[in-house]
Amino acid sequence: MNETLRNSVKTMLRETFEGPLVPGKGSWFTNSESNSGIFGVLEGMSYDQASMSVHGTTLAAHTDHIRYHMWGTNEILKKGKQPEMDWGKSWDIHSVDAQQWNRIQEGLRNEYFTLLESIDAIEWNELLANEVLSSLAHSAYHLGAIRQMLKVVKV
């Protein structure tokens, strides 16, 4: 992957998770204010809020599902093949306590930073490029879903 495209992918991933590079000065696709990425949206959310069911799923489940998908991406980048994954199980979280909620968020942060580092280190091919781009699209989709769920949770 050429350097320009690699840098663009990293920019989009950062915006998805960390929000716009310069809050208030525009963005590529999130809201332009700070904390509009996944980490900012989740910041300050209590474990009770993360456990509230919205149409049969929770913010904790969405957050861990993003982590799980990104873990799979990181495994593919490391080993060159898809790990065995149980997608149904990735939605099994119905309630969390404070410690579990912190662990889920920390796990997501770790997978995110692992992916960012890997983007500069891997030997690119079509499979790996598609996997990284799918992780970006998947995470952006769930950012939107989480933002919609928050309208119910924070009422």
Residue ranges: model-predicted function:
Residues 91-133, 139-140:
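Acidic/histidine-rich alpha-helical segments that form the ligand environment
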Residues 2-35, 39-42, 47-89, 124-155:
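Short, contiguous alpha-helical
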